[in-house]
Curated annotation (Swiss-Prot):
Annotated EC: 2.1.1.-
Signal in keyword set: no
Lineage: Eukaryota, Fungi, Dikarya, Ascomycota, Pezizomycotina
Swiss-Prot/TrEMBL cofactor(s): S-adenosyl-L-methionine
A Pfam family matched in the record: Methyltransf_31
Name assigned to this protein: Methyltransferase ktnA
Enzyme class, spelled out: transferase
Domain of life of the native organism: Eukaryota
Gene3D superfamilies: Vaccinia Virus protein VP39 (3.40.50.150)
Length: 303
């Protein structure tokens, strides 16, 4: 398959560094999702994989590491995202990592236009939103199925494009340290500001993917069988400044939903300061904190 030309450079050094650091937590969950999909043990035929709402390509990258050359020499990988900017990022990663037999294209997860009964595996992990922070482009990670305006249509598309016996693997957030820190920071600021609940934050666009029972129900309603749903935690240590940066990236999406414009103008800039103050008080001069999150991992089979 013809390799795609390199994507234009869109990050300065500072923003790229912060993006790479913040993407580690998503990478850990991508590896978990790939492992739980059992794709490494698939032996019936050549793999045909769709990385749905691929974002920065974390799943496709994890797949290459897990499967190795023996399987990727003969597989077909399609990476799709509705965001042209995310497609460019994934194309660049494809070039840098030498993905085999892969293509990256703009695809609407709710109406993919892809072949029916075609893929052995469909993955849908954490989606990415682009935003600006300082002088660079920044990304925030939100569950792809929380982003879809019509999540039922997206599930129907996953079911349609899978072969009989094919596997769908999905991950969604259920708790993150950056959401908790934002909540604490807002509550600490005078002004009686609306403080969204955890369910509010992870249900910004729809609330069907915030807990295990709801996720299981979505798979059942779409017609899947052999449904496995579990929650998984990941954690690693980072400088407190990185935790504060993670909050900055997500904050505008939260305040846009739950605050008035007047509240945003008056108080939004105070939230990162409050986050850093909370972290420094908690760590008592150590300067390190825990980047931690919990995600729902779900896999199922098309009959």
């Amino acid at each position: 398959m013809t390799r795609t030309p390199a994507a234009p450079e869109k990050h300065n050094r500072d923003s790229a560094s912060r993006y790479k650091s913040g993407s580690k937590i998503s990478t850990l969950f991508a590896e978990e999702l790939v492992e739980r999909s059992a794709i490494a043990g698939f032996g019936r035929k050549d793999l045909v994989v769709f990385d749905n709402a691929c974002g920065t390509g974390a799943i496709s990258s994890a797949l290459h590491r897990a499967l190795g050359d023996e399987k990727t020499r003969t597989w077909k990988l399609t990476c799709g995202d509705v965001s042209e900017a995310m497609v460019e990022v994934s194309k660049q990663k494809m070039i840098e990592e030498g993905w085999q037999n892969a293509e990256v294209e703009v695809v609407d997860a709710q109406n993919t236009g892809l072949l029916s009964d075609h893929y052995t595996h469909v993955f849908s992990a954490f989606g990415k939103m682009l935003g600006t922070q300082g002088n660079g482009i920044m990304l925030t990670s939100i569950s792809a199925f929380n982003l879809f305006p019509d999540d039922k249509a997206a599930m129907e598309e996953c079911f349609r494009v899978l072969q009989s016996g094919g596997t769908l693997a999905v991950s969604t957030w259920c708790s993150t340290v950056w959401a908790t820190l934002i909540q604490s920071a807002i509550a600490s600021i005078p002004g009686d500001l609306p403080t969204p609940t955890t369910e509010d934050i992870f249900g910004l666009y729809n609330k069907n993917w915030a807990d295990e029972s709801r996720v299981r129900a979505q798979f059942q309603q779409a017609g899947f069988t052999d449904i496995n749903v579990t929650s998984v935690k990941k954690e690693y240590t980072v400088p407190v400044q990185e935790l504060a940066e993670a909050c900055k990236i997500s904050l505008p999406h939260i305040t846009r939903k739950f605050w008035t414009q007047e509240q945003r103008d008056s108080y939004e800039a105070e939230v990162p300061k409050a986050v850093l103050r909370i972290l420094e008080e908690e760590q008592r001069g150590i300067g390190l904190g825990a980047m931690k999150a919990e995600a729902i991992i779900a896999t199922a089979r098309k009959p």
